[in-house]
């Protein structure tokens, strides 16, 4: 029997090991329900006894089989026949109970749960089992779906009283509410980085736990921030119900009798009529008279004439008469009852009396009297009057003529604006089509097409004179187009646009673009790819990140005319071309060291010329004649020589924040616009300081631009929604100063979100300018 039991236990152990392997492999994951109690699966005392006996039996059998050659075995280690028979009886009894009960049902569990069951089993009409559930007791604890946790019931007592205790208060049952555990500094840092849903950063003063918002509370906050109603159950715009017009009422709304005031004379009107009657009787109100009778009465009245100058006496003119100067008004010390601080002390009185009359500061001493009637006569009155007459007689007096100068005469004489024509005066064409702000405009070198870029991520090309849109492409659906600039030469029709961190080079299709011009433009853009494949581009170190990536934008954009995409490290805000069209500069104000980049079109090469800038770069431009490069930071403009690679000049406009600048086509003058509402003219040969500062706007100046076609015009664009046109003539003689005359202020753009006119550009030949506004329009001024 011992060996049989041992074999059975070994088989059971093998089966248990196999089941353990299957659970480890995840074959039975999730079979047990979470609602089952863990106590039902704990081993009972009987099972422990069986297992102990089995273990003892198994150990004995193994010792008998394996240790045949060992020493004698103690009698206590050998199992007795009685113990083995009792163990066998228990196993047989348990096996019978398992066979009787249904599989998966624990009889002990049913007996234990019988007292807690909320139902009873009855027989139905067919003899089957029917479950009858108890009535639900509608007490407060029965519905605990919205029940809150333990509430701190300490009342209006500060939690600082419990700082020295491990608990923070008591719940409604009088049990202690323990203080919540707090993490270390690392855990606090991780909690601040990984913010859970509904996190507010606040702590509940009652419990000390973090105070989080539920999903309903977050939805309520979101709706309040968006200006919506707190719930969706209310209709903010219900349909109007016409109660008195839509339904024909057959019965009167009110059957009250007619009020008495409808058929009785008004007492108030009777009082007003009596006032008029009394005024007529007293003659204060005259009856109406015809105009003829009124004129006849006026003619009958005699007119009284008298001489104003009847008693006037002639006086001899005395132009040399000068009135005497007035005496100084008396002070507080001349009062009959002066303040105490004006009265002299005993020492001061003795000092004044002992001094000579010529050495005294005053000819009198202040005295105090209780009443004005007690003031005696002034003994020095005759002496003072005599000395005053002597001063008027002997002291020379002259008449001084004041200079009455007209302030306008001090201003320089400027020519009349009518003599300085032509310049733009009216809005000729309005270009509408962008959604949101129009951030940049540019007129092509031929003066036929206009390119615009806006917040909707599109670039649009228009006919300048007609305002008709001829071409458009969407570059980015998330980022706005911050800058658009045409290539300055006429041998190609190439447009550069910046959207986010990408710069796109494209060839728009237009009626004025011939097939030869279109092919020449595409060849110029495709030259760089061949250059890169020939290996002529200098090899960059492998460890360094390239300054920019030149690639094709994709089939969709290539079909629309976009041929090259240049990806840089940060958002591009400014694009400016070199006069020859092979180089262009981009500025990314947030790019730090790589904020300014120079791109070579023929080589597909991008260079970062500066290792470090003393400030945030705002804009950059090439000199129109010489190999100079200008970079503007927030307060200064630096001029670099590209051949010698050195700093040439630092221009200091004195502005708080420079927004834009432009170089005169002659190359010797510079205009600067700033966010502090100032327009500054610099003469580069004269000084680093501004030659003239002009303040004509009430808001920030966004853009300034010279006319490139030889006309002495320049303009600025401001956030107040206006453009100021100036006549700026630069003489050929170095001894003469430039002539700057404001000639016209153009208004038409609307101010949206405190933004007005964002960009401006001139026609290459005509005195026309184009502006871009935050109201979503571009305007042609002629």
UniProtKB/Swiss-Prot annotation:
Record's subcellular location: Nucleus, Nucleolus; Nucleus, Nucleoplasm
Encoding gene, per UniProt annotation: ERB1
UniProt function note: Component of the NOP7 complex, which is required for maturation of the 25S and 5.8S ribosomal RNAs and formation of the 60S ribosome.
Organism for this UniProt entry: Chaetomium globosum (strain ATCC 6205 / CBS 148.51 / DSM 1962 / NBRC 6347 / NRRL 1970) (Soil fungus)
Membership in a protein family: Belongs to the WD repeat BOP1/ERB1 family.
Any one of the GO CC terms: nucleoplasm
InterPro entries in the record: BOP1/Erb1 (IPR028598), BOP1_N_dom (IPR012953), WD40/YVTN_repeat-like_dom_sf (IPR015943), WD40_repeat_CS (IPR019775), WD40_repeat_dom_sf (IPR036322), WD40_rpt (IPR001680)
HAMAP family per the UniProt record, alphabetical: BOP1
Keywords, alphabetical: Nucleus, Repeat, Ribosome biogenesis, rRNA processing, WD repeat
Region feature (Disordered): 1-123, 339-361
Segments annotated as WD repeats: 433-472, 476-516, 567-609, 612-650, 653-692, 696-736, 752-782
Protein name per its UniProtKB record: Ribosome biogenesis protein ERB1
Any one GO biological process: maturation of LSU-rRNA from tricistronic rRNA transcript (SSU-rRNA, 5.8S rRNA, LSU-rRNA)
